[in-house]
Amino acid sequence: PICSFEDFEKGSRKALLVMATGSGKTRVAISLVDVLTKADWAKNILFLADRTALVNQAKKNFVNLLPSLTTCNLCENKEDPEVSRMIFSTYPTMMNAIDETRSKDGNRLFTPGHFDLIILDESHRSIYNKYKDIFDYFDALLIGLTATPKDSIGANTYSIFDLETGVPTYAYEYETA
């Protein structure tokens, strides 16, 4: 079983899930969003990926499986982020959106408390010093997803999730898959 929800119940605010390519990382993320929104643990969700193609693919999968969830892809700039419960973005787009996106009343839309849950896709790639500011800025539960084997993930990635190096919250690797 994925233990991150249990960890959140115990007070942890971060989880790193290491799962083999093709084993369903996005599906797990969708299930977690479903459970956390139904439990009223997460009202607004941010999904971050390092490439626009991953953002687009993830949004498509979320919309297919959670059709009642209002979504916005900041990379496409078509939907209104103010009325969307789930925002999809690349890291650079989100960095700009924090300062530039305004609510209808002219205030900053993406305040530190705006998101309750942040999902980082392929988090081993995304943990650059310049993007760590996003995780520090928002006060939200943080779930990282990666297919990189746990022994190949850098120590700085584990430290972002407050984990011991080599010990992710959950691992479902090639040997198991």
Language-model segments: which ranges?
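RecA-like P-loop NTPase motor core of helicase/translocase proteins
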Residues: P1-A177
